[in-house]
Amino acid sequence: MKSQAFFLLFLVVLLLATTQSEAFLGALLSKIFGKRSLRDVDTMK
């Protein structure tokens, strides 16, 4: 159980690190979705 808690803590730290660099996160999302913004994905629905 300790390893699971440590893994969750690592995910939280990683999430905080990604939110600190929104430019990097935006570039990563654009690579994944192939769209300029998430609004384009919403209009596809």
From Swiss-Prot:
Q: Does the keyword Metal-binding apply?
A: no
Residues of the signal peptide = 1-23
* Chief localisation class: secreted
TM spans (from-to):
none
Q: Which residues carry this modification: Phenylalanine amide?
A: 33
Expression by tissue: Expressed by the venom gland.
Kindly state which keywords UniProt assigns to this record, in alphabetical order.
Amidation, Antibiotic, Antimicrobial, Cleavage on pair of basic residues, Cytolysis, Membrane, Secreted, Signal, Target cell membrane, Target membrane, Transmembrane
Q: Propeptide positions, renumbered to this chain?
A: 37-45
GO BP terms, alphabetized = defense response to bacterium; killing of cells of another organism
For this UniProt entry, what's an example GO CC term? extracellular region
The domain of life is: Eukaryota
Its annotated compartments are: Secreted; Target cell membrane
Task: Report the sequence similarity comment from the record.
Answer: Belongs to the non-disulfide-bridged peptide (NDBP) superfamily. Short antimicrobial peptide (group 4) family.
Functional summary from the UniProt entry: Amphipathic peptide that shows antibacterial activities.
Q: What is this protein called?
A: Amphipathic peptide Hj0164
